[in-house]
Structures are given as structure tokens and as C-alpha cells.
Amino acid sequence: MKIGVIGGGQLGRMLALAGTPLGQQFAFLDPAPDACAQALGEHIRADYSDTDHLRQLAEEVDVVTFEFESVPAETVAFLSQFVPVYPNAESLRIARDRWFEKSMFQDLGIPTPEFADIQSQDNLDAAVKRIGLPAVMKTRTLGYDGKGQKVLRHPEDVVGAFAELGSVPCILEGFVPFTGEVSLVAVRARDGETRFYPLVHNTHENGILKLSIASTAPPLQALAEDYVGRVLDKPDYV
């Protein structure tokens, strides 16, 4: 099988490193001339919105995926006309926007802190009055390694916070006091079969993941699998 990957960065590279020993071939579409995955497959150097090169990719591969959720949803929708794309466009639409993510969690009955859509400083001021402080403000899209977010602890932190995050659509979340963070990796096949890896406990330093250690907490594992199973089934994630 030849797999097309939107993005040729470190995540695409790791995908190819895992897939090549299994006999899979790869083609990467990435605008960067030095995309680090290019040594592991064909490199189509083009913008993610370049429909001519997207069509070329679709004609050369059996299936397409993407290495991160920052890919434009329009790219996936376009490719889906010509070749199977997994995860699907609906999964990407949700995963790339924190408002859609939180709304889905709420719809699925997964415990979620109170949150509000922020489109202006006035929105933020009103949301803070309703949700209270401390709270966490995040950009709705992008943001990683601690970027694109701000913890609001005091009234003075609220002043100018919308502009500080770039005056882009944001969400405000109620602050959750926590003792630790855990993550669960799951996979779901086209027929709906789902498998789960063991929970890992994460340690961050300055907003960047530093260490993940496998957990041995069966009750928490079962709860996490229940929540993740709901999230995967909702958009028919593959």
C-alpha cells in the first residue's frame, strides 16, 4: 500500500519509520524544501491548498492521512473526492477547533469544565463574570507547547488578554485544579473495532511534555477507554 501524508515533518517521519518495515510506501505533501520525512518517501513540495498537487497525490496513493490537525479542512474535503482519507473531514473539523472539541465532549456526557466562546474583549469580560477566576483562555485553533493560552488568575490579567492572544477566536475555560495529567492512545479501524494502549502519566516542564510513564491504574484505564470510545465513535473516526 502507498500512503499519502499531508505534512512531512517529524510526525510524518515517525509514521513512515513505523510503516516502512511493514511494507508500506509513503508520499508526503509539504511546502518545506527540507521536510524531514522526505528521505522516507516521495516528497511533493506544494502548499496544502494547491489543488493540482493534491490531485497528483491522490492519483499516486491508495489512502491519505495527515500528520497534524492544523491541515485546512478544505484540503481533506478536496482529497476525499478522489481517494479515501482517514481520519475523515468531520474528525479534523472537530480536532482542530477547541470550541468544537469541548462542545462534543459536552454532548457525549464527558465531564467538561464550563467554557465560553470568545470573539472580543467584551465577550471575555462577560464570560469571566459568569465562569469566574481563575480561568484559562486559549485560542480556538493552533497553539501547542504552552503557546496560544493564558491563565487568568486576577482581574488585571483579564485586561487586554484578547489582544495579547492575537485578537483571534478563543475559548475561556473554568480552571480545573488537578494533581496530574494522563493520556490514552487509541486506534479505531474502518469496521469500528477499537483498541487501547495503556494510560500514561505525563510530566510537563514550561508547558512542554518532558516525560510519559505507563500507568497501572485499571479503574482509571476503564474510565478513559469509555470516554475515548465515545469520542472515536461520534465522528466515525478511523
Residue ranges and their predicted role:
Residues M1-F100, D122:
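ATP-binding N-terminal substructure of ATP-dependent carboxylate-amine bond-forming enzymes
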Residues I94-S183, V187-K234:
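Active-site nucleotide/adenylate-binding loops and adjacent lid/helix of ATP-dependent enzymes
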Residues D236-V238:
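Short, intrinsically disordered, charge-balanced linker/junction segments flanking boundaries
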